[in-house]
Amino acid sequence: NSILEKTETGCKVLTELKDISRHGIVRIFELGEEMNLVDQYSVYLAGKPINDFNLELLPLYFLQCIKASDFKEAKFCLSEELRQKVDVNHLSSFFGNFESEKLTINEKGYFANLTYCVQGSYISKQYEFKIEKNKIVNILPCEEKKSI
């Protein structure tokens, strides 16, 4: 779902991400000879993050914050030690620009499958999340899988 608002120089588009925190992405376009994206930022559709969820969903919530470029809220999910080790650039480059995320919880732990589109092919990367005291203490990349 998107909402379009006309501006003096182009338009503003709000797209709901339908994630746990109720993020929306605002894209501002300028209209000249072509339509150009001039700015993009995330907002909370409820005015603030909705972060009172089942803690088993913590890795999913974290990834959805990364996807929405809400790095401040994403870092809130990390342990104090890990929070001090990583910055916005590290998180952004570590996970890249993924299209979808899926969380699997089993007896071995918490695993997230992220799907990326690379040159028309879909690639799935899996990450293992280590959680202690309701915070993420480590994130480990697993084996990469390609699909057609």
Locate the predicted segments by residue.
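Acidic, small-residue rich beta-repeat scaffolds with periodic aromatic anchors
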Residues: 2-148
